[in-house]
Amino acid sequence: MQVILKEDVVNLGYKDDIVTVKDGYGRNFLIPQGKAVIASESAKKVLAENLRQRAHKIAQIKKEAEEKAASMQGISLTIKAKTSSTGTIFGSVTNIQIAEELAKKGVEVDRKIIVLKPAVKEVGNYTAVVRLHKEVTVEIPFEVVSENETIIEAKPEGAPVPVAEEPAAEAEQAEVAAE
């Protein structure tokens, strides 16, 4: 089923896009919620006419997104998180925390347009993608640091583990030496 989106739908498309969705998703969710209409021939003609009339407005929105992207270039964030002794974060860093840190830097961004892949669950350097417009995205580098002072490096797999001798074995060795 083809539908015309009336608003941006995350992981599907942007306003005025014609997308193909499963019948149930279109009929039971998108259309009743007012997020889409069925893409009939007449609806496509109306959409084309509306896009021609709004071409100037769409160009202005894209220009504003590009200006905001230019202002976000060069921004890097540092996020403090509670961690275990091995550097694993309790919980994870989310797009909400990225939006809050950007707000502290003076850049207001809706958390829904920030994409983090893969999930951030350890201390280190990562990149968040901010989708300001369907054609304008910005990559924001950020570092996750520990609120704790010291972090012990996790032992690599296969590293030998020192084994303490048992006291009984030491006693047997002492008896053998005494004889």
UniProtKB/Swiss-Prot annotation:
GO biological process: translation
Keywords of this entry: Ribonucleoprotein, Ribosomal protein, RNA-binding, rRNA-binding
Region (Disordered): 156-179
Sequence ranges of Low complexity compositional bias: 157-166
Domain of life: Bacteria
Pfam name, any one: Ribosomal_L9_N
GO molecular-function terms, A-Z: rRNA binding; structural constituent of ribosome
GO cellular component assignments: ribonucleoprotein complex; ribosome
Compositionally biased intervals (Acidic residues): 167-179
PANTHER family tied to this protein: 50S RIBOSOMAL PROTEIN L9 (PTHR21368)
NCBIfam families per record: L9 (TIGR00158)
Recorded family membership: Belongs to the bacterial ribosomal protein bL9 family.
Function summary: Binds to the 23S rRNA.
HAMAP family documented for this protein: Ribosomal_bL9
Name of the protein: Large ribosomal subunit protein bL9
Species: Porphyromonas gingivalis (strain ATCC 33277 / DSM 20709 / CIP 103683 / JCM 12257 / NCTC 11834 / 2561)
Gene: rplI
